[in-house]
């Protein structure tokens, strides 16, 4: 019974994070768990997600 309860708690807590992923954010970026190598971090979204924008920072 405990494993089933743990699964339900995990799914309940994970749902808000999934709703925030791939949302548009600052400077037309996208919220992700981690930016790709070809993207730069410009801000943070909710739940410690990173707001990623394509391209490299200006020198």
From Swiss-Prot:
Pfam families assigned? Defensin_beta_2
- The signal peptide stretch is 1-19
Q: Which InterPro entries match?
A: Beta_defensin_dom
Indicate where this protein resides in the cell.
Secreted
Give the superkingdom in one word. Answer: Eukaryota
Q: Which UniProt keywords apply?
A: Antibiotic, Antimicrobial, Defensin, Disulfide bond, Secreted, Signal
Q: Which cysteines are joined by disulfide bonds?
A: 25-51, 31-45, 35-52
Q: Does the keyword Secreted apply?
A: yes
A GO CC annotation recorded here is: extracellular region
Biological process terms in GO annotation: defense response to bacterium; innate immune response
The role this protein plays is: Has antibacterial activity.
**Family, per entry:** Belongs to the beta-defensin family.
Question: How is this protein named in the record?
Answer: Beta-defensin 134
Species the sequence originates in: Pan troglodytes
The organism that produces this protein has a lineage beginning with: Eukaryota, Metazoa, Chordata, Craniata, Vertebrata
């Amino acid at each position: 019974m405990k494993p089933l309860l743990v699964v339900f708690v995990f799914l309940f807590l994970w749902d808000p994070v999934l709703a925030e992923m791939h949302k548009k954010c600052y400077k037309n970026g996208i919220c992700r768990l981690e930016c790709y190598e070809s993207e730069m971090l410009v801000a943070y979204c909710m739940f410690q997600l990173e707001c990623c924008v394509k391209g490299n920072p200006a020198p």
